[in-house]
């Protein structure tokens, strides 16, 4: 056989090698029973998606290191912060902090140069708890968080994050207390439960993904300038004397590519508004979400009258008594089917480039 013929045969073989391309533009299904199979079909392991993923991420995932932590300090390091300190700046490989069950009473910060870190709870039925009681009075609002992540490609699996500071009573100055601040890009959270009152989750900036999570709070308990999808996640408004406000998204202008997307979620608890116009062009979308009768009929709050023409608070095919649109504020828009198909997808956070399924760590 000639060299030309051999080359032709090899080319033919290569053309028929299957390459898995993650189509993150496919709309998220309305039926919650289909979510997992749909997600697993799109967000496959890195080994079959190398062609579409960030090259540096592909390299990092091939060199994973596991650090074991125990709440009594008998793991590879005595504390979470010691373990993080051991990771070099400009880290280029995945480092998995694997937590045994128990309480970890620390205020933890991952700096902006410590990329590719995973917090992994070994037992999803007995999840490790990160807990601290920082407040705005002591640290400032965004720095009060129990866990602060400023680096890229962070992931958390099977974890509880708690700010144990007391509920604000309207009298104490600086009583806000965040549990989590995520300021890095391309972060994912699977089966993570986040507890606080006012300002529980600072979804600060970057593209983020939450699946099968639980977030509770009172006032503005999800706030910031992130561009994030919340999928199959429970939003629990802690009952109190005043209605809760779930979101305070911080988009200032129409040109900013940020916003929160709640898809196939559940809103539970006491009386609540879905959000308020903290900033002039705040953008929050609720779709296929179960809303109990705790939701105020108007749904949303305008902080300033002039925000009426600039905020974007669309809703699409939500369910339950709280989803009734008859008494919604007049600035609330119903998405059309075409608009929903275009915007309610993993493509809005470019998931095909970076989002991976939750890591499963095999331990001896």
From Swiss-Prot:
Keywords linked to the UniProt accession: Allergen, Aspartyl esterase, Glycoprotein, Hydrolase, Secreted, Signal
Which EC class, in a word? hydrolase
Known InterPro entries for this protein? Pectin_lyas_fold, Pectin_lyase_fold/virulence, Pectinesterase_Asp_AS, Pectinesterase_cat
The species is: Olea europaea (Common olive)
Q: Where is the signal peptide?
A: 1-22
Name of the featured protein:
Pectinesterase 2
Identify the pathway: Glycan metabolism; pectin degradation; 2-dehydro-3-deoxy-D-gluconate from pectin: step 1/5
Post-translational modification, briefly? Glycosylated.
Q: List the disulfide bonds.
A: none
| One term under GO cellular component | extracellular region
Might you give the EC number(s) for this enzyme? 3.1.1.11
Function of the protein: Catalyzes the demethylesterification of homogalacturonan components of pectin. May be involved in pollen tube development.
What family name appears in the similarity comment? Belongs to the pectinesterase family.
Tissue specificity comment: Expressed in pollen.
Where this protein primarily resides, as one coarse class? secreted
Which reactions appear under catalytic activity for this entry? [(1->4)-alpha-D-galacturonosyl methyl ester](n) + n H2O = [(1->4)-alpha-D-galacturonosyl](n) + n methanol + n H(+)
Q: Which domain of life is it from?
A: Eukaryota
Which compartments does it reside in? Secreted
Query: Which sites carry carbohydrate?
Result: 103
Residues of the active site are 220
Name any one Pfam family assigned in the record.
Pectinesterase
Q: Spell out the molecular function terms from Gene Ontology.
A: pectinesterase activity
- List the GO biological process terms: cell wall modification; pectin catabolic process
